[in-house]
Amino acid sequence: QVSVVEMSDQVMTPVDYEIATVVHQHFKSKGVGLHLQEAVTAFRPVEDGIDVVLKSGLVLQVDMVLLSIGVRPDVKLAREAGLEIGETGGIKVNEFLQTSHSDIYAVGDAIEFPNPVSGRPSLAFLAGPANKQGRICADNVVNGNHQKYRGSISTAIAKVFDLTVGATGLSAKMLDRLQIPYKEAIVHGASHAGYYPGA
């Protein structure tokens, strides 16, 4: 038995609520206990495991706890080097991935870069953009600044048991908050080409 405790009204906050509700139902169909809009107030070691006390007063008796409570860029070294840290807490870089010190470049989860949709500073904790940044950065360091990084719209895909969930762009919640008009499309299709085994 697995239980998921989430402070938000949905799991996978980067996806729109309509997609998250499909994930919620899939969790339940697999026997996962889902506790939304809940918070953990205490962990109590007991003889045969751990009691997880929730804000509502519910106590979950578990063998193991896995904490996944967000991501923050590790910018300690950048601060010590005197590099500029942006409003999101990431290392501020220009289009060539240079930091505030022109001889120091930065890439990956630790950088802040304008989101191509909103124009606002953002972080992208994804392997795809980090890989692209690394290639652009290496080219710029070796050959001079001629490759520009244009940002990431944060396309992400996750496997939830046998369900594939993906999203691209900003969520409806974020676009509403930023007052950016948008159109959305929700597609329930195959996760890979039909001629592959298991399609």
Model-predicted segments: where are they?
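Residues at the C-termini of beta-strands that transition into short coil/loop
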Residues: 38, 95, 108, 186-188
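A Rossmann-like FAD-binding core segment of flavoenzymes
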Residues: 2-93
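A short, glycine/Asx- and small/polar-enriched loop/turn
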Residues: 45-50, 101, 197-199
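FAD-site-proximal beta/loop scaffold in flavoenzymes
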Residues: 51, 59-139
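A generic structural signal for alpha->beta connector loops
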Residues: 31, 88, 101, 179-181
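General small-molecule cofactor/ligand-binding pocket signal
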Residues: 33-35, 105, 183-185
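Mid-to-C-terminal Rossmann-like scaffold of FAD/NAD(P)H-dependent oxidoreductases
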Residues: 110-199
